[in-house]
């Protein structure tokens, strides 16, 4: 006789997926089969599930009844975790739900036989009546997972107890189906031309309020005749900023204090640049060239600052004549009847001031052009001084 195999105890921890019950820890043998373990769970598990309703999962794999635990559970571990999924049926609530389902299925079946002879349509209406006639306690029970599965099992063979969708998802699918069916119906009726739009709200005619009568002489200043011969008024703003320069891009440029008052960093940068220029000039040229360039640079700097102006600026003498007297009530047509000045009619006659300006605009000489080039070259080497402030 073959010797009996020694029992190999193993500890199993059974967990519920919906966490309705606490984890059950039990002791078993590695020689058990999965069917034997299900039969043991039907006796010790709180809800007493039947073996055919149980589903055991280990490491993500569904265990079959003929498999042995010795082949599934590794020997290195003494404790193994199993997940139990089962369809639990409550015997206390099942008679009430079955009675409600039976009553609801009999009533719509008798009333709809004459109207709807087809079986498919009657089945659909029967199922919808079942869901509609459930009372409030029934809805409270269906809100729980196990009660929802019981309700689906009681509806008929068309519904599965292990549906992957929840109760809210199924109702949402039903709403989407009804909306899609309604849109198809509207599209079909609109294409056939028999679509009647729903009665809209009663349109109330809008009565515009009459415009008020204009007030006589509301703006007396505008109704007065303007003086055509009045001199234009010059508005002088005494508080305007006088330190403004015109910008080529448009708009004035306000003089800032940073351009007038330089700080020590600007003076240090200027001194460093000038020292680099002197070092290059001293080491890469002779002493005579160095002194000549330095003298010319100093003279150009003094001229640039304004100490040695080579040519005084022309002073324009404007005649200090008062403004012409305003002629009151002058006829604008009198300007056409007055005699013109013979000096203005003669194109060869020019005023003395214009002769002087034309004499100054003669072509520059070669020396003035050379001096301008020399001055511009050395002036570009010198830093730009602060701009003059207008008085």
UniProtKB/Swiss-Prot annotation:
Q: Name one GO biological process term.
A: retrograde protein transport, ER to cytosol
Localisation? Endoplasmic reticulum membrane
Q: How does it sit in the membrane?
A: Multi-pass membrane protein
Q: In which tissues is it expressed?
A: Widely expressed; in the brain, expression seems to be restricted to neurons and vascular smooth muscle cells. Present in activated microglia in senile plaques in the brain of patients with Alzheimer disease.
Region (Interaction with UBQLN1) location: 115-200
Gene3D superfamilies membership = Phosphatidylinositol 3-kinase Catalytic Subunit, Chain A, domain 1
Official protein name in the record: Homocysteine-responsive endoplasmic reticulum-resident ubiquitin-like domain member 1 protein
User: Which species?
Assistant: Homo sapiens (Human)
């Amino acid at each position: 006789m073959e010797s009996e195999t020694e029992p190999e105890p193993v500890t199993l921890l059974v967990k519920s997926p919906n966490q309705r019950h606490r984890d059950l820890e039990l002791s078993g043998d590695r020689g058990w089969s999965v069917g034997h373990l299900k039969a043991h769970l039907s006796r010790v598990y709180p809800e007493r599930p039947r073996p055919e309703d149980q589903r055991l999962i280990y490491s993500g794999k569904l265990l079959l009844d003929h498999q042995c635990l010795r082949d599934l559970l590794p020997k290195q571990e003494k404790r193994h975790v199993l997940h139990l999924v089962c369809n639990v049926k409550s015997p206390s609530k099942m008679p009430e739900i079955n009675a409600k389902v039976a009553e609801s299925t009999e009533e719509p079946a008798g009333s709809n036989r004459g109207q709807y002879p087809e079986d498919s349509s009657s089945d659909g209406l029967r199922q919808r009546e079942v869901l509609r006639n459930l009372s409030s306690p029934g809805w409270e029970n269906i809100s729980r997972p196990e009660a929802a599965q019981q309700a689906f099992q009681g509806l008929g063979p068309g519904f599965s107890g292990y549906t992957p969708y929840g109760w809210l998802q199924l109702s949402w699918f039903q709403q989407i189906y009804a909306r899609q069916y309604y849109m198809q119906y509207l599209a079909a009726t609109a294409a056939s031309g028999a679509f009647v739009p729903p009665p809209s709200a009663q349109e109330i005619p809008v009565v515009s309020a009459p415009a008020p009568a204009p007030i006589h002489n509301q703006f007396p200043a505008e109704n007065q005749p303007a003086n055509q011969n009045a001199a234009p008024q010059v508005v002088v703003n005494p508080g305007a900023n006088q330190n403004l320069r015109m910008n080529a891009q448009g708009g004035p440029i306000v003089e800032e204090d940073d351009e007038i008052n330089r700080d020590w960093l600007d003076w240090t940068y200027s001194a460093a640049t000038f020292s680099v220029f002197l070092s290059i000039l001293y080491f890469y040229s002779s002493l005579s060239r160095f002194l000549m360039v330095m003298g010319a640079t100093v003279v150009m700097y003094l001229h640039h600052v304004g100490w040695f102006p080579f040519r005084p600026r022309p002073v324009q003498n404007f005649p200090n004549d008062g403004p012409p007297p305003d002629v009151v009530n002058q006829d604008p047509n009198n300007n056409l009847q007055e005699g013109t000045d013979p000096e203005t009619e003669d194109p060869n006659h020019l005023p003395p001031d214009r002769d002087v300006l034309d004499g100054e605009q003669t072509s520059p000489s070669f020396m003035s052009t050379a001096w301008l080039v020399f001055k511009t070259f050395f002036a570009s080497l010198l830093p730009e001084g602060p701009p003059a402030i207008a008085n």
